[in-house]
């Protein structure tokens, strides 16, 4: 849990919100070091993928800073770039998550494998597509969100806190979408609720929720949380000796959360 992780890290003054804020402040990467830090983490994740999963050592994703975008990070696969929104603060753990999510073993590896499989005929042509708001888009995000777990890269209490925090905030973005589209609340009403529950500033939350108005990005909001949960639930059942077979099953088939769990043996 977040509380246990913070205690282990020495942030144990008693108030969870204050301890978490202090830990995040202490691990924030300075803005001018964000891109170099992400680049280093991309190098590390690529090496780990080549060692235990797939050899993508000839592939690269160049990190590029952007501003005023409706996303934190975006995998521009055709141009092999990771666009990172520098309007937001990032801890080193958040950048580690983004390196694995957007590139190795996340979107870059997933899309690269689909391309290979379509080219050699082992996957039908529509397998190369990523369709917004489809059942398979959940797995597209779920694979990426479990990247650190696939690489056995959750090796510190800080990693554990960061993953728990990322999942909490992902769930809260689903709540925000429901409040906006079903309950018809304004963004001014939603932001303070999500900020308080997610232990973030209202400024950060307002920026993070901008994608709820974006035609392409908005439909993916539920895919992140649901996909992460779906992949994590099956991954926990996979013994180490079966990991390579599982990855082929996961990356090489257009799954939904239901089929992923139903047909894995």
Feature-to-residue mapping (PLM):
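N-terminal maturation segment of proteins
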Residues: 1-265
């Amino acid at each position: 849990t977040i509380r246990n992780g913070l205690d282990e890290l020495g942030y144990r003054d008693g108030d969870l919100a204050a301890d978490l804020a202090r830990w995040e402040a202490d691990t924030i990467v300075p803005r001018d070091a964000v891109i170099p830090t992400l680049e280093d983490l991309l190098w590390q994740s690529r090496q780990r993928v080549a060692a235990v999963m797939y050899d993508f050592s000839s592939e690269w994703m160049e990190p590029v800073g952007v501003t005023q975008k409706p996303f934190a990070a975006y995998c521009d696969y055709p141009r092999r770039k990771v666009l990172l929104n520098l309007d937001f603060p990032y801890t080193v753990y958040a950048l580690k998550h983004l390196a694995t999510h957007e590139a190795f073993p996340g979107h870059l590896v997933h899309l690269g494998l689909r391309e290979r499989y379509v080219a050699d005929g082992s996957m039908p042509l529509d397998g190369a597509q990523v369709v917004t708001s489809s059942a398979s888009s959940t797995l597209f995000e779920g694979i990426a969100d479990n990247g650190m777990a696939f690489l056995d890269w959750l090796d510190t209490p800080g990693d554990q806190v960061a993953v728990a925090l990322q999942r909490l905030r992902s769930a809260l973005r689903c709540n925000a979408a429901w409040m906006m589209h079903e309950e018809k609340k304004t963004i001014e009403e939603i932001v303070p609720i999500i900020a308080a529950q997610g232990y973030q500033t209202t400024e950060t939350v307002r920026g993070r929720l901008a994608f709820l108005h974006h035609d392409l990005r908005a439909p993916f909001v539920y895919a992140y949380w649901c996909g992460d949960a779906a992949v994590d639930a099956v991954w926990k059942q996979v013994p180490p000796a079966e990991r390579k077979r599982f990855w082929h099953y996961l990356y090489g088939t257009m799954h939904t959360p239901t089929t992923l769990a139903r047909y894995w043996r």
